[in-house]
């Protein structure tokens, strides 16, 4: 009841704030041709003239086919997405319009992201209720989420999509980060449901079961490697599914605005079935660029981590790198795309100036260099028109893939 009341108050506050559009703005934020009954995103159009062309022999849908089997995965540049599924629409009635205005960090579906070359995904399952289930034992399910907003796709449906792509493109692999996004306090059955889904017979052989720091591309082709932000065993002593867990501290500028490069470079990854199997993890996830100082910090820490990654990937040490481009200038789709439009050109310039690979780089607003769309807020006054933004995300993806040329066959 308290949670429902909170949602209602949040919706009222958001509608009041978002309803402050001037009359002159209505023509550009609302078009009768786009029905407000649509569930999530209105795609008004994309001008996809990509600034930096993909000029490799294999199609981008199968770009890993160019990489040697013996190449270590940790030595590659791997493009990915943050809050991968927010381009799939939200689940809760009425509230979905509020979340459309606050929680969208992607405007492309999972299928589009896979086809555009993304190989790292941010998957956030939470315990939810299947209102259509007739069997009480099947009422609780895992639905994907971004914070408190539940998405219109389940954990199982997401894995099914990943599996279908890998069957059609067996040269590829995926790395998927797991976390329970709205906290564990109400997620008592989270690991039980996680194990229930991951152990389904239809997924036999789909997941990497014997991760090592130096695992190779050949060993991962056709498979999904699960990374958890935390050790799941204290939550459920019986949970021993092959998931790699990470020592992944938060980087919230509201708590500590200063950068801490040493802490970013002293994280770790562990094989959950054998914690003596361990890798050093370089992790950068400074996720709020809500002031000029924080934007400068983000730009500095992303580029600095790219330079550290190049130094690490040429050594014999199997160091893993996850360097997030993603962040937000405000809690809205405009906030995610503004950060991307400010940061991605600097990352692109660095990739053009320096050779070498840079690890995993998750981004927002993937698959497009120019984004032009309407976000559905449920009324003409609360719809948001995003136009004139150039995140250059697909150009960034092309450069990341092309930086792997030293590992090509």
Where are these regions (language model features)?
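N-terminal secretory signal peptides that target proteins for export/translocation
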Residues: 1-2
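Long, acidic (Asp/Glu-rich), low-complexity accessory segments flanking structured domains
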Residues: 23-116, 129-168, 173, 234, ...
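C-terminal motif of bacterial Sec signal peptides marking the signal peptidase cleavage site
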Residues: 16-20
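Active-site groove signature of glycoside hydrolases
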Residues: 127, 170-185
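Conserved, mostly hydrophobic/aromatic
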Residues: 124, 176, 226, 361
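Acidic, His- and aromatic-enriched active-site or binding-groove loops in soluble protein domains
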Residues: 151, 155-158, 195-212
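Aromatic-lined glycan-binding groove of carbohydrate-active enzymes
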Residues: 222-334
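Sec-dependent N-terminal signal peptides
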Residues: 5-13
